[in-house]
């Protein structure tokens, strides 16, 4: 940003939440994993709100089929197969807000991505596979990082109508509950998602034998619902930096919205997760996260 311009772009945030909160935000390093339908909106909001540095992780490129939901992506990006993280970098640079950007056009399941994300202060997960969501919970535990998990679910009723439209935001604090302990997924589902990524043939065999359930690989996505979920998550972050809710933040460990059923509820954290909690505060270990999959060449 040009001299003097960054202060101008941040003035509204300071007016709403105070100069002290803005100063904290400008020092924060926030990792956003997943830069598609929900992640691109989160990135847009964080950059314009005044976050100092964004670490962006996504292995995919822009395609025509997702132009309906990736903020700042263009038809030319789809033609050129521009990496999604580069679309985000370009957009943030054009904003002139002064937000620094680090990008990794690779899978979170690469050691270099885990190391980059571990250097953040806060994690945002905008991914739809349970193994990636579980991995983010583990990274948060090992490196004592708070994690905001965003989920969006649209289901058709098979008759041309809609069964449900809903979204959720989970705040996972180190040493507390996890997505696993809250019942968002099971370890069998994590295993199945991992096999889909690493050995889909073996997964198909296990499903055929009845040992594992299949994995739904894609869901419909609508930008308006993605934006609702992203805004809920970013506002949750703001509430934790500058408390503004009538109820304390401890009552908002999980927030759920159903547009189809006209519901909004929130709840406090439950018992600590004994599975994810095994790595609490371990930090850098060999192999990373105590998992041979993430062994690095010496």
Residue ranges of model-derived segments:
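N-terminal charged helix/coil linker that caps or initiates catalytic domains
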Residues: 1-31, 252, 292-298
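Glycine-rich adenosine-cofactor-binding loop
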Residues: 18-63
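Residue-level detector of anion-binding/catalytic polar loops
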Residues: 52, 100, 146
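Glycine-rich phosphate-binding loop and adjoining beta1-alpha1-beta2 segment
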Residues: 56-96
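E1/E1-like adenylate-forming module used to activate ubiquitin-like modifiers
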Residues: 103, 114, 119-228, 245, ...
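Conserved acidic residues
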Residues: 105-107
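Short loop/turn elements that flank and shape the SAM/SAH-binding pocket of Class I
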Residues: 109-112
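Internal hydrophobic alpha-helix adjacent to the cofactor/substrate pocket in enzyme cavities
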Residues: 227-247
